[in-house]
């Protein structure tokens, strides 16, 4: 974050999703503060947030993803041959939004919330307004943006105090767009049968064409439209976060097709793909779900 704020390139510390882990730490710490105030912890978090705010100011448009900005600045959201499944651009912004909501609830401080709303507005304008098919290649933002929608809907005074361009319904629209655009892609690369390196090269060569996007495969629940999926598939954390987001969205939009889809997936998961311990994700390779009733004693499990 400090390097982004200074406008330098290179030398990112760790993989792209480390941004998200920092935001998740803030979210978790905020929950502690909500139940038990701790001035020392709050001061420490305020220091982190100040550095995040400074980094967010560098782009000038609300975008903040330290890996992409330091290492691949021409590849925002996987454009120009970038690899979004690695970059985690959408995931990280979702984690920021969720952290900001939790931190405001705990402290009523708005610095991180302003950063998050600017990022949310940017991503709405870039994806929804332009009707791009981009979806989170790692779910999590779905639930986070619903939380932002609810926070602003339930606190009109907060909206007024922030003095930002805020229409909370845009964030719910964006989540529906993400959910309903899974499976809507160029039908390639063939992650199920191809070599990963070949698939990545296919993406970097932009063989998906203009005004389209690559598939992220069943690993990222992108093999068919979300609301048509019959079994829970792929990376266990991604899959459970996706359908948690669908549940959150259904509680707001009350669309029957959302309810039907999540009940179907829930039944498949808990009756056929969950260990007696409650763990899911039987296969270590790709940390993913197995077939129905594939529940070995030496399973991976999340």
Task: Describe every region a protein language model picked out.
Residues 1-302:
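Glycan-recognition and catalytic cores of secretory/periplasmic carbohydrate-active enzymes
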């Amino acid at each position: 974050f400090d390097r982004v704020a200074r406008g330098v390139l290179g030398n990112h510390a760790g993989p792209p999703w480390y941004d998200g882990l920092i935001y998740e730490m803030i979210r978790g710490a905020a929950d502690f503060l909500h139940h038990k105030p701790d001035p020392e912890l709050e001061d420490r978090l305020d220091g982190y947030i100040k550095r995040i705010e400074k980094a967010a100011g560098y782009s000038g448009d609300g975008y903040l993803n330290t890996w992409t900005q330091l290492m691949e600045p021409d590849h925002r959201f996987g454009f120009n041959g970038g690899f979004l499944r690695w970059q985690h651009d959408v995931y990280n912004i979702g984690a920021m939004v969720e952290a900001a909501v939790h931190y405001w609830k705990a402290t009523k401080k708005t610095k991180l919330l302003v950063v998050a709303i600017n990022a949310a507005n940017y991503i709405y304008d870039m994806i929804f307004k332009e009707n791009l098919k981009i979806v989170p290649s790692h779910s999590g933002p779905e639930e986070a943006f619903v939380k932002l929608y609810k926070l602003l809907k339930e606190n009109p005074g907060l909206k007024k105090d922030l003095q930002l361009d805020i229409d909370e319904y845009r964030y719910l629209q964006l989540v529906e767009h993400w959910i309903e655009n899974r499976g809507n892609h160029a039908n390639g690369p063939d992650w199920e049968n191809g070599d990963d390196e070949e698939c990545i090269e296919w993406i970097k060569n932009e063989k998906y064409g203009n005004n389209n996007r690559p598939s992220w495969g069943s690993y990222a629940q992108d093999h068919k439209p979300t609301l048509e999926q019959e079994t829970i598939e792929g990376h266990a954390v991604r899959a459970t976060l996706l359908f948690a987001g669908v549940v959150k969205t259904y509680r707001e939009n009350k669309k029957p097709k959302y309810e039907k889809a999540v009940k179907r997936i829930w039944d498949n998961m808990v009756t056929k793909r969950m260990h007696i311990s409650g763990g899911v994700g039987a296969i270590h390779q790709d940390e993913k779900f197995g077939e129905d009733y594939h529940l070995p004693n030496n399973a991976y499990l999340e």
